[in-house]
Amino acid sequence: MGNSKPLPTISCIIVSVLYFSFYCITPTSSSASIQDQFINCVKRNTHVSFPLEKTLFTPAKNVSLFNQVLESTAQNLQFLAKSMPKPGFIFRPIHQSQVQASIICSKKLGIHFRVRSGGHDFEALSYVSRIEKPFILLDLSKLKQINVDIESNSAWVQPGATLGELYYRIAEKSKIHGFPAGLCTSVGIGGYMTGGGYGTLMRKYGLAGDNVLDVKMVDANGKLLDRAAMGEDLFWAIRGGGGASFGIVLAWKIKLVPVPKTVTVFTVTKTLEQDARLKTISKWQQISSKIIEEIHIRVVLRAAGNDGNKTVTMTYLGQFLGEKGTLLKVMEKAFPELGLTQKDCTEMSWIEAALFHGGFPTGSPIEILLQLKSPLGKDYFKATSDFVKEPIPVIGLKGIFKRLIEGNTTFLNWTPYGGMMSKIPESAIPFPHRNGTLFKILYYANWLENDKTSSRKINWIKEIYNYMAPYVSSNPRQAYVNYRDLDFGQNKNNAKVNFIEAKIWGPKYFKGNFDRLVKIKTKVDPENFFRHEQSIPPMPY
């Protein structure tokens, strides 16, 4: 696979988010435990039997196994600390009817739920409830069937499947089909799709949410709906309105997109000294959203070197839908400052490019996509996001570099927009960050277990976020919903959602689409059955 090497950093914090919460009332009084009542109720409301030893996990029965299941897909390790709230038990359904039954029974018994597919959400809302306790966890990891139909250029995908599994199953059937989804192959489809979902094909084909054809979803009454049954308003809301507000999607029908047999990837790293006048990073800001849509170039900025000799590296990771000869000609004309050469480029298939961007070692077999784990491991981290509308001037860049050097184990990921992202109206789906957006920033800081610098790293995120205010979007200052940040604000306890408070953080994620989301929520879930710390609120009665 040539000289291009994946950057061993951030692929798996380009994440997905699946958090669903369930209505909570005063628990039913009974001699039997809530756990027993729940299981008995589910059995009465499903036609598919299930072995308890494979579907029910409790700390009382087997704390080791319970912890193993709880931790299995949790990606942000700070939320597995002993001080964090834990579910009373975990139920892992093996059939969609058991998800329907879980909703029906939660209403009857007054149990508060969180639902998880891949566990990559930044604030752990899919497996931690700060606002309502006790709660239980519905784990969808066993609902992972994928049916690819090349003749119709489509596929049905269940929420527990990962992006890597989806990519593998597509490539298994065709070398010239793909799907515009994310870099991190261990992300679960379930939540990823609900936030819109972006990746290296976004400039050519838009978001994952832009390429959804149909769904199967369970609503607040436990009813199974498809696109025709739910209507276009609800279908619109669930393709980018964030998980946990409208229902549980049990399967997505997605549109496959054409990809060439040959894809070219490249990696070019420049230090601050090599780009002392900042011409390369400045030119990237100008052209990355305007270059032909077959090219996607993201940049990772981070500190490097020893304490006495620190610098900043800017790593340009690119993908071109075509052969390297064509790429080099385009880059020489549009972005000569990068100095891209033939030896920087590697030709490969689309599925091999997925391995490259996922951070897998060069030469890894594509079957590694079925292992479900990220090659980069898990992390203790804090992250947030911004959207940039105008190029950041040199003085602003210098302030960023200064803070990166001070932050140590921190980095920024800049993802270019433009292309198809500028052509799709911001009201097409709830994800509104379209025409006029140059690039998105991910701010990221990580630390080790029991690291005394954790509070400093969290403060670093807050400080650089404040510093960047003059250089990013405003009124509202926008953010990506799949990069949830509770520092923007959150709903309060129980079902008492303050619409005024939600108006503070809601437009950050959705801009003007937030009001439409609230209207749809009020219509389909007026009792606020599905909720979490940043779920869409219904209008007050």
UniProtKB/Swiss-Prot annotation:
Keyword vocabulary terms for this entry: Cell wall, Disulfide bond, FAD, Flavoprotein, Glycoprotein, Nucleotide-binding, Oxidoreductase, Secreted, Signal
Segments forming domain FAD-binding PCMH-type: 83-259
Keyword Mitochondrion applies: no
Cofactor(s) named in the record: FAD
Superkingdom of origin organism: Eukaryota
Keyword Secreted (UniProt): yes
UniProt name for this protein: Berberine bridge enzyme-like 24
